[in-house]
């Protein structure tokens, strides 16, 4: 391993010990914000520090085995130990390279998940509902919280559009590769001839940004409309204009929120989604510039990004970005998404490593 990388790892090890000392300091414990920030940093440094210690141990094993090679009686055993230690060292070196990749500061944030029905009419809305259920199930397994911000229901079930906030550890980093177009092939319940229909929905995943970090939005750039919430009827339908529609005139971005009975709460929710969308649009421009130089596995949430096809007759799901096909569609729709998410995360990391080696 390069001496410059070893030096960086030694510095991170020192910082890990320093942060641990801070966490035992009474003044730090009393400052909840600082304590949380340092706890997060400590957790992030723990993996790389542990891996570095194991790598150093493997180097010691290599050195000890090489010294035993001169002993005729011990040579055979030493050669076997050397082989094992070198293989372990190489494996740990690869792990360390991944752990040292630049971190996206947004990865630890909560996110807004937006699902919109695309082509396919009622079937597209039903599929959007199935997708939301899939992500909700996945969130349950990760112990994340799901809060619906806004929903427009389809006439025969599902959603024309739904926006939810998902909160928990590392939410955005885990879900950010879901942005893009998702296509379904199946026989709709209303199809009497048994023909397979193709419909689609688009998914956008945006980091939920704290209010202090949101882009400044000029009030003069906003058009705010109020209207009566739509619903299925009954006692919970609003009789006042509590629903909010906010249009950001410079970008044309429109956000509606009618989930709360309070107009004030709906407006606050809509503004947080609007801020996230404006920031996401700015990030998208940067991503597109980078994608012109190398492939970009991070989708933009645009329907032209063809992420996956879910083929129900064959029980097959295909991720077109990395040519991955699994015949485990039932499990995927029940929220077992790690089998799809982890391969693309690994591919993304491989691309990052490739980019870094080109710079070197």
From Swiss-Prot:
Pfam families per record: PCRF, RF-1
Maturation and modification: Methylated by PrmC. Methylation increases the termination efficiency of RF1.
Family matches, as InterPro entries: PCRF, Pep_chain_release_fac_I, Pep_chain_release_fac_I_sf, Prokaryotic/Mito_RF, RF-1
Keywords, sorted A to Z: Cytoplasm, Methylation, Protein biosynthesis
PTM sites of type N5-methylglutamine: 235
Region described as Disordered: 291-312
Subcellular location, record wording: Cytoplasm
Bias (Basic and acidic residues): 291-308
Keyword Cytoplasm attached: yes
Example of a GO MF term: translation release factor activity, codon specific
GO CC terms of this entry: cytoplasm
Chain's role: Peptide chain release factor 1 directs the termination of translation in response to the peptide chain termination codons UAG and UAA.
Similarity field: Belongs to the prokaryotic/mitochondrial release factor family.
Protein's UniProt name: Peptide chain release factor 1
Species per Swiss-Prot/TrEMBL record: Yersinia pestis
Lineage: Bacteria, Pseudomonadati, Pseudomonadota, Gammaproteobacteria, Enterobacterales
């Amino acid at each position: 391993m390069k001496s410059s990388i070893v030096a960086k790892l030694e510095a991170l090890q020192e910082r890990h010990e320093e942060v641990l000392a801070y966490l035992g300091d009474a003044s730090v414990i009393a400052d909840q914000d600082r304590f949380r920030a340092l706890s997060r940093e400590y957790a992030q440094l723990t993996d790389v520090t542990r891996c570095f210690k194991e790598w150093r141990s493997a180097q010691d094993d290599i050195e000890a085995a090489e010294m035993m090679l001169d002993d005729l009686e011990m040579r055979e055993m030493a050669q076997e130990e050397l082989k094992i230690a070198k293989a372990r060292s190489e494996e740990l070196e690869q792990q360390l390279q991944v752990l040292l990749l630049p971190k996206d500061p947004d990865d630890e944030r909560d996110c807004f998940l937006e699902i919109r029905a695309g082509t396919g009419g009622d079937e597209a809305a039903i599929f959007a509902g199935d997708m939301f259920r899939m992500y909700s199930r996945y969130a349950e397994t990760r112990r994340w919280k799901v809060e619906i911000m806004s929903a427009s229901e389809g006439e025969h079930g599902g959603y024309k559009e739904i926006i939810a906030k998902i909160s928990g550890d590392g939410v955005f980093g885990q879900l950010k590769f879901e942005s893009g177009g998702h296509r379904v092939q199946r026989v709709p319940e209303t199809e009497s001839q048994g023909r397979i229909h193709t419909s689609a929905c688009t998914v956008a995943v945006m980091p939920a940004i704290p209010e202090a970090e949101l882009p400044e939005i000029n009030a003069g750039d906003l058009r705010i409309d109020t209207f009566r919430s739509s619903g299925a009827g009954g006692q919970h339908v609003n009789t006042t204009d509590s629903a909010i529609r906010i249009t950001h005139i410079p970008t044309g971005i429109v956000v509606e929120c009618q989930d709360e009975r309070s107009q004030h709460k709906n407006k606050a929710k809509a503004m947080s989604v609007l801020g996230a969308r404006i920031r996401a649009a700015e990030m998208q421009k940067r991503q597109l510039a980078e994608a012109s130089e190398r492939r970009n596995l991070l989708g933009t949430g645009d329907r032209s990004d063809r992420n996956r096809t879910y083929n129900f007759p064959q029980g097959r799901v295909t991720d077109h970005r990395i040519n991955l096909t699994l015949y485990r569609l039932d499990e995927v729709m029940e929220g077992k998404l790690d089998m799809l998410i982890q391969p693309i995360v690994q591919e993304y990391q491989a691309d990052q490593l490739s980019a870094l080696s080109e710079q070197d």
